[in-house]
Amino acid sequence: MSKLFERDDDIVALATPFLSSALCVIRSSGASSISKFSKIFSNHSALNSAAGNTIHYGYILDNENNCKVDEVVVCLYRAPKSFTGQDAVEVIAHGSVIGIKKIIDLFLKSGFRMAEPGEFTFRSFLAKKIDLTKAEAINEIIFAKTNKAYSLAVNKLSGALFVKIDTIKKCILNFLSAVSVYLDYEVDDREIDIPFDLILNSKVELKKLIDSYKVYEKIDHGITLVLAGSVNAGKSSLFNLFLKKDRSIVSSYPGTTRDYIEASFELDGILFNLFDTAGLRDADNFVERLGIEKSNSLIKEASLVIYVIDISSNLTRDDLLFIDSNKSNSKILFVLNKIDLKINKSTEEFVRSSVLNSSNLIMISIKNLEGIDILYDKIRTLISYERVEIGLDDIIISSSRQIQLLEKAYALILDLLSKIDRQVSYDMLAFDAYEIINCLGEITGEVSSEDVLDNMFKNFCLGK
């Protein structure tokens, strides 16, 4: 059993944020959880005799001070029909910070202890209610940053990844069974149909899962979009437009943004990490120079750069330098802003004649929202190489633990195929096949070490 959760006692934790809110949920689990909780519940006799999966109304009682603490609704579960597989009580109370403290304190005085992060999910795993892929999916649902990431996590919660891993494992097991028959009964291998094709098929399926991790990284980590340009060109206004709220300071004074500001937004299910950089210019002091150096570094690392130019003014020296060095750069979108003002024809003509790819140049007015739809379409086009079209039923690997085990299994399969080609002894083939099966079993938790379980579940939320 895991070192983190070595006691099979009664546990309690707040399952909702510790904030003032309309309602909160306090969950508990353990063999004696119902009888212990009934001591602080007004309708205790009905609770002790109630069937599982029932709801009860009453009050939390502070018996020492002979007073009511809160009016609550209690959800009662009896083993094995609960998330943890144990008797369990969930209290729905008013979301008062003071009330939450009082109720949990009464739980602790009644013999419960505070649960560790992830301990409820760990008990569910021990009770075989979920496998490790489902446990990880629960955490992914909670921390999903985009609608796409959320939907993919829900798909895994339904058991899709477990089924896929189990299917591959059964293919290897069928191969191992055939080889074992040959070894156990010493029959001629010509009399046995050794399913070598199952190993080849498993190799293909494992490679698909491994490649899917790259898709997840793009979904989870997002695409870096940097706003650059000379001071007062409209970068901060565009930044706020993307976010649909004010995060950057917008003023008529040049150089308002001295460093960079970071935020994120979602477009078509893709997460964008947005940076509003310090305006490119000759800095007068050390702090400004540092900010501009950071801006230049971000521009180099970005997936996409929107370079904003004030089309109502003359080009700055920094505009000219940037255009000259990036006129053929496919990841730069030149945006001529402020078309609501009088257009500086020399600025427009110079930019149009300098930028080699005219499709990477658009004119907009952030103030009047003119050309903004075109801007979004351009962004979609320019990051198309980063986008991966996936369906909600697709299986995506999302944890470093899973990808490490899949890569290990894939390496073992390549080694097994090499040995098959070299016609090595069947006992060596059987050993390798067994290693692959164990490796796949670690992904689902059928084979697992205490250290792996400790490391995985301690990263969960308290109350999960």
Curated annotation (Swiss-Prot):
GO terms for biological process: tRNA methylation; tRNA wobble uridine modification. This is tRNA modification GTPase MnmE. Keywords: Cytoplasm, GTP-binding, Hydrolase, Magnesium, Metal-binding, Nucleotide-binding, Potassium, tRNA processing. It is an enzyme of class 3 (hydrolase). Binds 1 potassium ion per subunit. Its EC number is 3.6.-.-. Mg(2+) binds at S236, T257.
